[in-house]
């Protein structure tokens, strides 16, 4: 099942906000903070990619 447009847009918005947070964290915070923010970005990206892959598999 693919993500709804509303959820997909919310995730894209979240990624944008997290990228901004990562940029600030890289300059001012301890490295583990940046690491966790980057991990959140990766998880959102992975969720969106896997959702697309599952949809293609289910179509066949």
Give residue ranges: language-model regions.
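N-terminal acidic leader/helix
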Residues: 1-28, 32, 44, 49-58
């Amino acid at each position: 099942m693919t993500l709804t447009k509303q959820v997909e847009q919310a995730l894209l918005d979240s990624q944008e906000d997290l990228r901004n947070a990562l940029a600030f964290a890289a300059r001012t915070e301890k490295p583990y903070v940046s690491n966790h923010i980057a991990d959140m970005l990766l998880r959102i990206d992975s969720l969106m990619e896997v959702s697309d892959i599952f949809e293609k598999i289910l179509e066949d």
